[in-house]
Amino acid sequence: MKEVIQDKLGRPIRDLRISVTDRCNFRCDYCMPKEIFGDDYTFLPKNELLTFEELTRISKIYAQLGVKKIRITGGEPLLRRNLYKLVEQLNLIDGIEDIGLTTNGLLLKKHGKNLYQAGLRRINVSLDAIEDNVFQEINNRNIKASTILEQIDYAVSIGFEVKVNVVIQKGVNDNQIIPMIDYFKNKNIEVRFIEFMDVGNDNGWNFNKVVTKEEMLNMIEQHFEISPVAPKYYGEVAKYFRHKDSDAQFGLITSVSESFCSTCTRARLSSDGKFYGCLFASSEGFDVKALIRNGATDDDLKAQFKRLWSIRNDQYSDKRTMQTIENNRKKKINMNYIGG
């Protein structure tokens, strides 16, 4: 039986984001800078990750509490061995209406068919530039944008619905906005531009690196005729715009200039098995893995999940100032543990 639960600000729980690994094959500066995540960096050992059975058990209980959507993240989730088996298990959960995956796309040709056969239908690909030299500078692994574009084409060809996410940094890749809109408009693939956020401790964020929604729109409107699109559902994070000469759309995710904390319905499970109520969480998180491995029953887990959501009052982006950023520095969980 489903229950309706709300947090302290009246927000229901609708989404569960699961990080299945803290590892990644890219070293993007805004997430896993190579100076910190070098060859000698120690990632989580296999036994510290939640098993697929544990993740499925958790997801079943969250579905009873109102979760309808699950997104699989990382790190890079396609590095998790046999990920399609998790998708198969999640697809059997009553009440889960949508399962998505966020990936850098590099391994889609290798794993895409198995994932599609397991029931995955929606993929978000993180691609921060369309020009090879710009993209190589960002990912620090000499991976060309053209390589990822080929992977996207493959994913579309076997039936996936693909969206593209682009984190925009001033002076780094803001010159990619127009060519990316132009390219994906012709492919009829939604591209979403994300304001650079202060996630984690190590990405060197400050306000001066942010290209705001208004700045992006000013750029875009010099090249395209567009009109706004009404939100599709409560809690939608992207603000969408449609081209007047086609049905193609693009989105802007404005977590800095126009935050959306008031409608956030996401619970997050980190790669080391901890619950977080916010992408910018500065706490240690609640150790779900320890609870499970110490013999908790489903009723025990359900009671804890209800409690954690009922006391949730996170609204970091609504209150973001340089002072709050400084106060939380070195306390926030890094993106490779909690996903984007």
From Swiss-Prot:
Residues 8-229 form the Radical SAM core domain. It is an enzyme of class 4 (lyase). Pathway: Cofactor biosynthesis; molybdopterin biosynthesis. Pfam families: Fer4_12, Mob_synth_C, Radical_SAM. The keyword Ribonucleoprotein does not apply. InterPro entries: Aldolase_TIM, Elp3/MiaA/NifB-like_rSAM, MoaA, MoaA_NifB_PqqE_Fe-S-bd_CS, MoaA_twitch, MoCo_biosynth_MoaA/MoaC, rSAM. Binds 2 [4Fe-4S] clusters. Binds 1 [4Fe-4S] cluster coordinated with 3 cysteines and an exchangeable S-adenosyl-L-methionine and 1 [4Fe-4S] cluster coordinated with 3 cysteines and the GTP-derived substrate. S-adenosyl-L-methionine binds at residues 30, 75, 126, 197. Transmembrane segments: none annotated. Its cofactor is [4Fe-4S] cluster. GO terms for molecular function: 4 iron, 4 sulfur cluster binding; cyclic pyranopterin monophosphate synthase activity; GTP 3',8'-cyclase activity; GTP binding; metal ion binding; S-adenosyl-L-methionine binding. One of its GO terms (biological process) is Mo-molybdopterin cofactor biosynthetic process. Monomer and homodimer. PANTHER family: MOLYBDENUM COFACTOR BIOSYNTHESIS PROTEIN 1, MOLYBDOPTERIN COFACTOR SYNTHESIS PROTEIN A. Catalyzes the cyclization of GTP to (8S)-3',8-cyclo-7,8-dihydroguanosine 5'-triphosphate. This is GTP 3',8-cyclase. The gene is moaA.
